[in-house]
């Protein structure tokens, strides 16, 4: 008798995606981050649902409702800090996941890669809107500054900003629509994740060698389910340690002050995971130029597959490309640091140099290194 998981219409899909999925035998722990991102999304949806039960999307009561969640709701503080720090874990896993894709040449799986970039944009939009909801000082001014960037778009910019605000400034209408969008987007992200996996399972996973592994595959369960479970335990350990011992480590103290449109904080800055893009935005003195650079800093990932002329898929056997990849990582860490600093010398110059290096590495230096390596290998 054939197993029910192989016959039942619904269980068959789950079986082919999570149990009997043919997987390369040599994928490393860096391939764990896909499942960890799924876990992060689940944690965010569950904690977010409980927070939404007690939160009120109104400018007069939003801040108080968050305080009420932390003080009066059973384990409300735990749920709130798990949600806030869960977002940080989400982005940490996202950045490693994208970095692994760049290092091992997973961008050659075009459909999977492009859906992944759309997912990245969606998660960034969701996180930004979530940061506005507590209605603290940094929430209000972050929303004002970032949405106001759209006014740089010629002709329609000002109208677009007022349309997003629902008025002539960030107000109750803005908060209400941000809450509605913040609630619905994770479910849209879940649907995109399904499409991401659908495209991935069409081609099969890449592996550290970049070699075809069709002749040598192993089932996903039990080998990679146990491996993923270990990664999940480590993620939960890190999340719990942060949420329970250092809940405000990654937050901004200004957000414990209720939003005041008459008082601007000395340094307006987003959460740590947006600082690299914020530094690129600030490094260009022109408003429209800054906005374009900000969008291109992520959108550039879409053209990476067309900029890489390498004959070997992964960087495993390409020392020059490896060296440049780690320079790129160091550059992004520098940009993250600069994004959190005030706009004054020497930070302005460092930010401009780091931003230039980021785009030069992506567009010119790394593709050139690929050509040099091809030449050295006589390919």
From Swiss-Prot:
Record has Oxidoreductase as a keyword: no
Co-factor requirement: heme b
Protein name, as recorded: Cytochrome b
Note in the entry: Heme 1 (or BL or b562) is low-potential and absorbs at about 562 nm, and heme 2 (or BH or b566) is high-potential and absorbs at about 566 nm.
GO terms under biological process: mitochondrial electron transport, ubiquinol to cytochrome c
Note on how the cofactor is bound: Binds 2 heme b groups non-covalently.
Entry's family note: Belongs to the cytochrome b family.
Location of the protein in the cell: Mitochondrion inner membrane
Binding site for heme b b566: 97, 196
A single Gene Ontology CC term: respiratory chain complex III
Organism of provenance: Lepilemur ankaranensis (Ankarana sportive lemur)
Matches recorded under InterPro entries: Cyt_b/b6_C, Cyt_b/b6_C_sf, Cyt_b/b6_N, Cytb/b6-like_sf, Cytochrome_b, Cytochrome_b_C_euk/bac, Cytochrome_b_N_euk/bac, Di-haem_cyt_TM
TM regions (residue ranges): 33-53, 77-98, 113-133, 178-198, 226-246, 288-308, 320-340, 347-367
Keywords from the named record: Electron transport, Heme, Iron, Membrane, Metal-binding, Mitochondrion, Mitochondrion inner membrane, Respiratory chain, Transmembrane, Transmembrane helix, Transport, Ubiquinone
One Gene Ontology molecular-function label: ubiquinol-cytochrome-c reductase activity
UniProt-annotated binding residues for a ubiquinone: 201
Protein task: Component of the ubiquinol-cytochrome c reductase complex (complex III or cytochrome b-c1 complex) that is part of the mitochondrial respiratory chain. The b-c1 complex mediates electron transfer from ubiquinol to cytochrome c. Contributes to the generation of a proton gradient across the mitochondrial membrane that is then used for ATP synthesis.
Membrane-topology descriptor: Multi-pass membrane protein
Subunit structure: The cytochrome bc1 complex contains 11 subunits: 3 respiratory subunits (MT-CYB, CYC1 and UQCRFS1), 2 core proteins (UQCRC1 and UQCRC2) and 6 low-molecular weight proteins (UQCRH/QCR6, UQCRB/QCR7, UQCRQ/QCR8, UQCR10/QCR9, UQCR11/QCR10 and a cleavage product of UQCRFS1). This cytochrome bc1 complex then forms a dimer.
């Amino acid at each position: 008798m054939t197993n029910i998981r192989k016959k039942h219409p619904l269980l068959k899909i789950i079986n082919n995606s999570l149990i009997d999925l043919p997987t390369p035998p040599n994928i490393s722990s860096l391939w764990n981050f896909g499942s960890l991102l799924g876990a992060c999304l689940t944690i965010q949806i569950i904690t977010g649902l409980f927070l939404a039960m007690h939160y009120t999307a109104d400018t007069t009561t939003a801040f108080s409702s968050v305080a009420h969640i932390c003080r009066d709701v059973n384990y409300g503080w735990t749920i709130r800090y798990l949600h806030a720090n869960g977002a940080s874990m989400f982005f940490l896993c996202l950045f490693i996941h994208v970095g692994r894709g760049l290092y091992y040449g997973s961008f050659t799986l075009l459909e999977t890669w492009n859906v992944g970039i759309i997912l990245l944009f969606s998660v960034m939009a969701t996180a930004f809107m979530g940061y506005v909801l507590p209605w603290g000082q940094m929430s209000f001014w972050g929303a004002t500054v970032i949405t106001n960037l759209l006014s740089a778009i010629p002709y329609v910019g000002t109208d677009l900003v007022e349309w997003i605000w629902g008025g002539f400034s960030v107000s109750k209408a803005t908060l209400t629509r941000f809450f509605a969008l913040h609630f619905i987007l994770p479910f849209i992200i879940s649907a995109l994740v399904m499409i991401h996996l659908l495209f991935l399972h069409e081609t099969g996973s890449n592996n550290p060698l970049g070699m075809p592994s069709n002749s040598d595959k192993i089932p996903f369960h039990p080998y990679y389910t146990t491996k993923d479970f270990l990664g999940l335990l480590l993620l939960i350990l890190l999340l719990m340690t942060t949420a329970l011992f250092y809940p405000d480590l990654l937050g901004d103290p200004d957000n414990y002050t209720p939003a005041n449109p008459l008082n601007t904080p000395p340094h307006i800055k987003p959460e740590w995971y947006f600082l690299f893009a914020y530094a690129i935005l600030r490094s260009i003195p022109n408003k429209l130029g800054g906005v374009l650079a900000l969008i291109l800093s992520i959108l550039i990932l879409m053209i990476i597959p067309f900029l890489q002329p390498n004959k070997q898929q992964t960087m495993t056997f390409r020392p020059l490309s490896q060296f440049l990849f780690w320079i790129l990582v160091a550059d992004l860490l520098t940009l993250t640091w600069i994004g959190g600093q005030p706009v004054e010398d020497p930070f302005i110059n460092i930010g401009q140099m780091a931003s230039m290096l980021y785009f030069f590495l992506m567009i010119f230096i790394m593709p050139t290194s690929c050509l040099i390596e091809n030449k050295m290998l006589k390919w």
